[in-house]
């Protein structure tokens, strides 16, 4: 029957027939050692003729590179062995064998196990040892039946964190790999008996593995374990597991202590800043969800303390008035809020409800309240705090009527519910709910019960006593009652001393025979911050009516806070409030103190005074004059003196103001032409808008006169503030640097312009009548202002324009004939020229520059010296943070975000910022080595850039969504002289060529088949690689992990500290080896040159002159000397290298940042 198959590797037909007959009897087909490179066509059909239900297939010791898809027709195959083949990946058909229980692919060249391995739900044994695997998929942990996992002799560096979730694994062999640590989840292996992780790079073992009760053998030989682990391993398995449990407890306590916040003492209290992460990704049974952990300020909620944990449920949010059913929790160890996603039947949103903690079953029980539609409730829900699951139990008995602001507490396995505002009014009934049988009951009580009330305070004391205080009905109450659950009798307690004023919504608790009272609202709704206590009688309840305990008021040391919630538990007060006076919020009571010191101060004068005090830190040109500057200043002063003599009633010229160091400078030298690196500042509009946005406008201290101080544009950019003169100086310097013909001009401006007030701009232009007459009578405005004037002739400027620096606008009138806006500096009559005036006076004044230009000697007027201001620069972060050109830029701290983002820039296409064109995100400390991501929403394109060391050695990834490319290429043309529109090329047989022989056609056909197969394989490999990249990137983005910086001594762990030490030592070792190689290379080069010179000498010695022989001897001597020096240097380097290595190791171990974790 094997005749139709032809040759079958190295197996003869008789042997094949024998093995097929054996498969018919034993359901096991052995095709090992057959020399197969692939299973031939028809193999599956041939085997099915003999036995279609084979359960074991042996294909070991062949040259197989893949398996055909037809193999999945063996539906009953349970054992598949592919040892010692040439597989580079597990064939895809293997994952489609539903009954497979044993799979052996050891001794191949497999580099990766696909996620599809999770489809083999019946797999019991998996052997992929002796391959080139570097990682294992997370889906491996979903195999419910897996008992044996053998991955030894591979290149594993990481194990999936969920590996310990394998429920039935018994044997696990991970030896001879490159593992540096084991996942902590391996401590969850419930049935494991043998674990082999020998011959790896492990330095420690997860302490959670100390709980492996079934473990019988644990091989840790040939690793890099520290001394403590080595010593415990040698003592035996039981003692080593006990050591791991001790390590786990120690690390847990250290982690709690490390993450514990540090409080600020405020009297007897400690104040903490509560933290909350926005956008945290939380894993649930339904998948991953993103939660907002900010616990917004609310009212009508419940705050319940469970040990060191605080639970907040429900309430009305003050930010928007919405009603919520969210559950938040926080521990005293971390002071960090968490919005807990819960399962089960969640209660509807509510407020003014009651809640208590079930101590026996670890549950939070919630009753009643009001919905968002103001409907009162009387339902019961409880939350299992172990599984975070809500339940709505079915209760029996007569339940309380729907109500709000009832109070509840826990006693003897029951919830005690008292009072509240029901539909018919306030109540004073008391209910008990058995939390085991969920049975409502209302016992009969005697004595003087409290009057109906709501929002009172309730607590349990002395075992069986229930205390009730205050609350409100039509009035706010102050009475105190006690009820004994044994005698079922109510008693009102008459008190003396400083009795707390009437209040409601407060808290009471019993601690060490003292009843404490805190907080509440008084009759006017004002918050009370006082705290009271009263000593309780030591006898039975009967003594309460006659003992008259005395109230004592304590100084609570709590300032006022408009929103505060508190709990009293186990002698500790826990208060959650809005803001803190101690931790940064300004106390309003101090706002009226020191009014004399709060008078407005000129910010510029204060900055200048500070610069004068620290002038020694400024550049030398700021505090001194060069010789050239001194000559120009003398010339300018002479000119200014003559001008004042000629025009005594004119405003003095603004020529030599003082700089920020108090040194007079010529005003023209204060401009510093500078071309910055930012392209947005190369044009007029961009530079003008930048100055208006970047610098904060400050009015002049004296708006009627120019400022006494004109700081350099460098200081104005550092201060990021200034008046019109400072802003104009900065803008003119930038425009000059990019080629504009810019000047700073001085003039008068209306009050709204000087004050940068645009509220009445339109109204001022429409005023007529009396208002206009009053303005004319008051004369023209004399408020001083500065602009930037840009003249035509450069940078394609066609007409002159004036720029308002504080707004970046160009709407200033250039009509010089308008006398209301322009005033001539020199009158029409001019001034005396040198030819008409007194020559002696002119000579005395040094020319003064006041003549008409006739007979002037050019050398008399000095040239303007270079600017005393350094070249302007703007830091990148300062430039980016101003949000120019429809951009929003955000920068984050290195450790502030969970995803490692440090910069985010969003570009918009419109001024309203509604159309996003590009999003640039920069990351750091990412384990996936992601450096930058650019998203173009309009093009559905994403570009990601990676650092070295990324998976698949990725450098860049370009992802384009919804991009379909056709299979036919047509070239289209337009505007051609030959009228060509498009070209579409096809190929056919050349009719003029000689007809090929059949053998040639067969050979070509065979080669094309092989080429087609190779091409298809390349395509499949490419598709597989692309899919793996996409899957890996998806997993990385869903499980982002960050590398802890070595300088973060708070968060860095021991293994990370060890890694820092190893990197430092490796860097030193590489540098020492590199230096040794350099010395050796130079030594080899000198030795080769000497040998070549000696060979040449011996060959040409007879023809060499005496001078040449002397030169040879001199060069040989120099070479020998250099070789000797290099040999000595190499020996000394080898001797010192080891010493330097141990010296650095000792320094690292003694370093304070690493010693606590390494030693």
From Swiss-Prot:
Region feature Disordered, mapped onto this chain: 827-857
Q: Where in the cell is it found?
A: Cell projection, Cilium, Flagellum; Cytoplasm, Cytoskeleton, Cilium axoneme; Cytoplasm, Cytoskeleton, Flagellum axoneme
Q: Where are the LRR repeats?
A: 21-46, 51-74, 75-97, 99-120, 121-143, 144-166, 168-189, 190-212, 214-235
Kindly indicate whether the keyword Repeat belongs to this entry.
yes
Residue spans making up a coiled coil are 1050-1137
Give the superkingdom in one word.
Answer: Eukaryota
Which interval of the chain is the signal sequence? none
What post-translational events are described? Phosphorylated.
> Which residue intervals correspond to the Kelch repeats?
309-360, 363-413, 415-463, 465-513, 515-571
**Which InterPro entries does the annotation name?**
DRC7/lobo, DRC7_C, Kelch-typ_b-propeller, Leu-rich_rpt, Leu-rich_rpt_typical-subtyp, LRR_dom_sf, MORN_DRC7, Papain-like_cys_pep_sf
Any keyword Cytoplasm? yes
Question: Which keywords are on file for this protein?
Answer: Cell projection, Cilium, Coiled coil, Cytoplasm, Cytoskeleton, Flagellum, Kelch repeat, Leucine-rich repeat, Repeat
| Gene Ontology CC annotations of this record | axoneme; motile cilium
Ranges of biased composition (kind: Basic and acidic residues): 827-837
The primary location reported for this protein is other
Q: How does it assemble?
A: Component of the nexin-dynein regulatory complex (N-DRC). Interacts with DRC5.
Described function: Component of the nexin-dynein regulatory complex (N-DRC) a key regulator of ciliary/flagellar motility which maintains the alignment and integrity of the distal axoneme and regulates microtubule sliding in motile axonemes. Involved in the regulation of flagellar motility.
Q: Which family does it belong to?
A: Belongs to the DRC7 family.
This chain's protein is named Dynein regulatory complex subunit 7
